[in-house]
Structure formats: C-alpha cells, structure tokens
Amino acid sequence: MADFLGMMKQAAQLQSKMKAMQAELDQIEVEGLSGGGLVKVRMSAKMEVRGISIDPSLIKADEREVLEDLLVAAHGDAHRKAEAAMQEKMQALTGGLGLPPGLGLG
C-alpha cells in the first residue's frame, strides 16, 4: 500500500512539474533559417509559430516559388530546434523517473 501511495504522490508531483514545464516551453523561442538567412521563422518550444521574416529581395512575383520553398525549409528548421528544446526540458523533468525514452507526457 505504501508503494501505491508513493507512486500516486510521485504522479501528482510529475503533473505539477509538467504544468511548470509547459509554461517554460512557451517562453523558449527558437529561430529557423533558410536561404542563408533570407527567410526566418520564429517558433516557441511548444511548436507555435511566433513570426516570419522575409528578406525584401525575395518579394517579387517571379520569386514566389522560391519563397514558398524557403518558408517550408525555415519552418522545418524551427520545428527541429523547438523539438530539441522540448526534449531537453522533458529529459530534465523525467530523467530520474526511469521512464521509457520517447514517452510523450506533453
């Protein structure tokens, strides 16, 4: 019975820490780049796009397809960085709990 109560207490603590981590992830911002920095996407570690910056040289009718490709690439770069930031926070939170890797608690 004591083991069960201990596990319940640990689960409650983990839930509290997860809430705090979600707030921290919202504060972390990463920037994805493409085209040598001509296109930038800012994203929170919660995968929310915060902003997009496009170099004026790309805003031409004949550059539309290039711009679209660069936007996709910059978003992908930002997404990878946000995922890495989230994984780092998750590892810090769950590192001592012996949970299986990749367990999505977020």
Curated annotation (Swiss-Prot):
Record keywords, A-Z: Cytoplasm, DNA-binding
Domain of life from the UniProt record: Bacteria
Gene3D superfamilies xref list: Nucleoid-associated protein YbaB-like domain
Gene Ontology MF annotations: DNA binding
Matching InterPro entries: YbaB-like_sf, YbaB/EbfC
Subcellular location: Cytoplasm, Nucleoid
Main location (coarse class): cytoplasm
One Gene Ontology cellular component annotation held by this UniProt entry: bacterial nucleoid
Entries under HAMAP family matching the protein: DNA_YbaB_EbfC (MF_00274)
Subunit composition and interactions: Homodimer.
NCBIfam families named among the record's database cross-references: DNA_YbaB_EbfC (TIGR00103)
Record's function text: Binds to DNA and alters its conformation. May be involved in regulation of gene expression, nucleoid organization and DNA protection.
Family statement: Belongs to the YbaB/EbfC family.
Protein's name according to its UniProt entry: Nucleoid-associated protein Rpal_0620
